[in-house]
Amino acid sequence: VKLLKLKHQWVKINKNDFIKNLNKIIIKRHNPLPTLTSYIQWLMYQEISKENYKVVLSGNGADEIYSGYYDHYLAQLNDLKKNDFNKKYKKWKKNISPLIRNPKFKDIEYYAKNYKKILIGENLSKKFGVKRYNIRLKDDKKFKYLLKNRMYNDLRYESLPIILMEEDMNAMFFSIENRSPYLNHKIVKTIQKIHPRYLIRNGYNKAILRDMLSNVAPKHIIKNFEK
């Protein structure tokens, strides 16, 4: 923050308030929080409301639209096996593979055949649920490329819908309007027309977004493989 010279305000988290806040949240929204991230975001909106801000802009959708997840690398490598695979594989092996902790996200061929099983993960209802549920992953195939299909399903059915729903509820709790400018339909349709080889480039995901921000964002962020 100091390096970027940004105005900011830290959100302090008091663990003693957790149960009290959780009860307050659940009573108002009538459903549980899916992740701890939702609670932290609620705390952030609480602080924003104290400053009397009425509109919040978020970066929601950037990972889904521009290819920002680790499994997107594997999808792209499977798409490009007969093209510039070797060059991109070397970049991935050197810069990205060491960052990945899940071994299933390091096996290119296994991913192509089992990505639905990997993304669903363990069915915890069999361990902890009163009732067991069979979890299925919707997998629309709108494009001929695995990467673009994965991004489409991320956008429509998987990660983004729950993220948007959670942010809407947290924002509405404090009468704040939240907006996600990356989800402009013109941006989405334009990116969907681009060949997958250009979405991840030189080992960097979100390559197009990095290009657009190259004269705006600091180099240590643009050139960070973890961003």
Please place each PLM-identified region on the residue numbering.
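ATP-dependent adenylate-handling active sites, centered on carboxylate activation for C-N bond formation
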Residues: 1-135, 169-215
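Charged, low-complexity surface segments at secondary-structure and domain boundaries
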Residues: 8-11, 134-145, 227
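Structural motif
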Residues: 34-35, 141-155
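Residue-level recognition of hydrophobic positions within alpha-helical transmembrane segments
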Residues: 60, 144, 150-152, 162-164, ...
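Intrinsic disorder/low-complexity signal
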Residues: 62, 106, 138-139, 153, ...
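Short Ser/Thr-interspersed hydrophobic loop/turn segments at strand-loop and sheet-helix junctions
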Residues: 155-170, 191
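PAPS-dependent sulfotransferase catalytic core
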Residues: 217-227
